């Protein structure tokens, strides 16, 4: 059977990989690179080249069992990663990192800084409550909930919103508009509300493009990038795939 897979993110790559075991599979990607959220870029620092993942970076064994199985099956090498969080604002006058008391109070002035101490206790209180929060108005946003809980400005602007913005690669105003339900489920499932015993995080050795290239090499058909699919039309014998003013039958 001839099959088309549209999109080369982890869903598209894995679908194309498994279907390729018994069928001819062509892969279509609208972007200029394969991998979707898995995207590695190269930066030059003088004579040194550094490869950086700007999308998919980390995973853990607790919440990514199928991804782990997929990587193991394809002998993708992984290594432990540092999943820490730090903030520095106002020319380092307000800064901390989330690893241990020495990191939290890296600026010793914070020991007597009321604004910082309030943020610190808001973190403990908010995390403890949200880790067990299962009943709530599903229509409200994260910003609505933060206003309802009357947490400090410092907690919102120097902790939670920067963290949400970093995780989902979005500006602060969009982080505030995130549905509370989605935020809670993600943080609960990934152990991000835990103040201790958080899961160990891992990353793909030599960056995520190594796994993308590995899987692409095992897909049976052609790989097309810069090919946005504009329409899929089904008929009694299969489908017509439309792209770039052309169409192809599958």
Where are these regions (language model features)?
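Conserved beta-strand segments of alpha/beta enzyme cores
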Residues: 24, 51, 77, 221-223, ...
């Amino acid at each position: 059977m001839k099959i088309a897979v549209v999109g080369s993110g982890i869903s598209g790559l894995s679908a194309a990989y498994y279907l390729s075991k018994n069928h001819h599979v062509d892969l279509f990607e609208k972007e200029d690179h394969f991998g979707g959220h898995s995207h590695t870029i190269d930066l030059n620092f003088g004579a040194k080249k550094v490869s950086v993942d700007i999308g998919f970076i980390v995973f853990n064994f607790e919440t990514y069992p199928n991804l782990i199985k997929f990587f193991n099956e394809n002998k993708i090498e992984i290594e432990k990663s540092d999943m820490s969080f730090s903030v520095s604002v106002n020319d380092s006058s307000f800064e901390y990192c989330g690893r241990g008391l020495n990191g939290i109070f890296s600026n010793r002035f914070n020991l007597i800084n009321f604004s910082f101490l309030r943020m610190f206790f808001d973190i403990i209180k908010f995390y403890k409550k949200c880790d067990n929060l299962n009943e709530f108005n599903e229509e409200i946003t994260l910003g609505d909930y933060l206003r309802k809980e009357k947490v400090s400005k410092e907690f919102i602007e120097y902790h939670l919103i920067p963290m949400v913005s970093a995780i989902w690669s979005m500006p602060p105003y969009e982080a505030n508009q995130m549905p509370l339900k989605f935020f809670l489920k993600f943080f609960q499932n990934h152990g991000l509300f835990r103040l201790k015993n958080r899961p160990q995080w891992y990353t793909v050795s030599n960056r995520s493009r190594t796994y993308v290239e590995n899987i692409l090499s095992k897909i049976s058909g052609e790989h097309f990038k810069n090919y946005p699919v504009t329409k899929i039309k089904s008929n009694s014998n299969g489908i017509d795939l439309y792209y770039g003013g052309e169409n192809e039958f599958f």
